[in-house]
């Protein structure tokens, strides 16, 4: 085998489309049909254009309201998940992380009231829903809110 005998694998290289080079094949109108907007240079319509009909993105109702970019996103733990701890245990964000109920300390922890709790626990978290606080105290436990702003500084 010599250098001049090397050639690419069959079908690996495709000839480019040469348009407007004579009457055979793609000559004359170059695959653009006859006249009209799409036959002209730069003649494509913008995305979402429906031929002058009121487009779908204007026909549908808009989202309303305000999105607060500075809102605090919480790592949520439901009180039914706290039943995995022994009665009398002090539950903190550190113990929740060790138990795999939260992923990391990036977000503050909020305890919500889904499910029910059947043991007395001392729960420390950054935020509690009113119903969760009431259920923990009704089960004989204690609730302590941690100041999240103090942790950031």
UniProtKB/Swiss-Prot annotation:
PROSITE patterns: RIBOSOMAL_L15 (PS00475). Pfam families: Ribosomal_L27A. Part of the 50S ribosomal subunit. Gene3D superfamilies: 3.100.10.10. GO terms for molecular function: rRNA binding; structural constituent of ribosome. The lineage of its organism: Bacteria, Bacillati, Chloroflexota, Dehalococcoidia, Dehalococcoidales. Residues 1-47 are annotated as: Disordered. One of its GO terms (biological process) is translation. GO terms for cellular component: cytosolic large ribosomal subunit. NCBIfam families: rplO_bact. The keyword Transmembrane does not apply. The keyword RNA-binding applies. Belongs to the universal ribosomal protein uL15 family. This is Large ribosomal subunit protein uL15. Keywords: Ribonucleoprotein, Ribosomal protein, RNA-binding, rRNA-binding. It comes from Dehalococcoides mccartyi (strain ATCC BAA-2100 / JCM 16839 / KCTC 5957 / BAV1). It comes from the Bacteria.
């Amino acid at each position: 085998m010599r250098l001049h005998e090397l050639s690419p694998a069959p079908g690996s290289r495709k000839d480019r489309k040469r348009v407007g080079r004579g009457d055979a094949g793609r000559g004359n109108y170059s695959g653009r049909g006859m006249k009209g907007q799409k036959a002209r240079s730069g003649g494509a319509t913008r995305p979402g254009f429906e031929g002058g009909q009121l487009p779908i993105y204007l026909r549908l109702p808009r989202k309303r309201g305000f999105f607060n970019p500075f809102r605090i996103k919480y790592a949520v733990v439901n009180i039914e998940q706290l039943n995995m701890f022994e009665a009398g245990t002090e539950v903190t964000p550190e113990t929740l992380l060790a138990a795999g109920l939260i992923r990391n300390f990036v977000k503050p922890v909020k305890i919500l009231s889904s499910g029910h709790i059947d043991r007395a626990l001392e729960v420390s978290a950054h935020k509690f829903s009113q119903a969760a606080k009431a259920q923990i105290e009704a089960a004989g436990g204690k609730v302590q809110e941690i100041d999240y702003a103090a942790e950031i500084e």
